[in-house]
Design a protein with these regions (language model features):
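Signature for the C-terminal beta-barrel architecture of outer-membrane proteins
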Residues: 1-117, 134-146, 153-176, 197
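Predominantly the C-terminal beta-signal and adjacent terminal strand-loop region
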Residues: 176-201
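Short glycine/proline-enriched coil/turn segments at helix->beta-strand junctions
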Residues: 147-149, 185
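Compositionally biased, low-complexity repeat tracts
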Residues: 116, 125, 129, 182-184, ...
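Extracellular/periplasm-exposed beta-strand and loop segments of Gram-negative cell-envelope proteins
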Residues: 125-132, 176, 194
Length: 201
């Protein structure tokens, strides 16, 4: 059938969801943004300002406004330079594929799964998207700092819950540290240590 743009997009989102025949498609929509805010005395005290970024998506039609019933989202804050004359940066990020299920408990296992296409949005069993998978939440913090012109130290912390719609589900607590040697602008070597505590009854 004709797959020309933009007709196929309108056809997929104006028609009823989950149809059969030549309208049997996996319907997804996403929007993302990045906002750069310059340094403002007393308000944004960071020398290089900061960045706010985010992404929101929905499975099977944007069925409810302003927030779809099957929505998932990611939001973050990035500070490229925390202190004047220093290379310390900071990233704080939160992602949620469980938001729709919490609002509508009957909508479980929506993200990265699909009933007509039983493999879902996956490759070899892994989701083509956020590693927390469906019905999950993820909180992530990372900072890096150059010790020399070619040696960079990094550390991160991660709290994650997967498949929260199940009676018992996996919880992960993770802390990591890494060291990167920039041999050249195109070649780098990295070593690190990660500690994880998994609760998966």
């Amino acid at each position: 059938r004709d797959q020309s743009f933009p007709g196929v997009v309108f056809d997929a989102y104006i028609s009823e969801p989950n149809q059969t025949g030549n309208r049997d498609v996996n319907e997804q929509a996403m929007a993302d943004f990045r906002l750069r805010i310059p340094s403002i005395p007393y308000l944004i005290p960071f020398p290089a300002g900061l960045q706010l970024y985010g992404e929101a998506g929905t499975e099977d039609k944007w069925s409810q406004l302003p927030v779809p019933s099957r929505t998932a989202f990611l939001g973050g804050l990035y500070i490229p330079q925390v202190f004047q004359g220093d290379t310390l940066d900071l990233r704080i990020e939160y992602a949620d594929t469980d938001y729709g299920r919490r609002r509508h408990p009957e909508l479980r296992q929506v993200w990265y799964n699909n009933s007509p296409y039983t493999s879902g949005m996956r490759y070899r069993g892994f989701p083509l998207g956020h590693h927390m998978g469906t019905d999950g939440t993820d909180f992530f913090v990372r900072t890096t700092r150059y010790l020399t012109d070619t040696l960079q130290l990094g550390a991160n912390f991660n709290l994650q819950e997967r498949d929260r719609g199940q009676p018992v589900h996996e919880k992960k607590r993770e802390a990591a540290v890494d060291l990167t040697w920039w041999y050249s602008k195109d070649v780098q070597f990295m070593g690190g240590y990660t500690f994880q505590r998994l609760t998966n009854p």
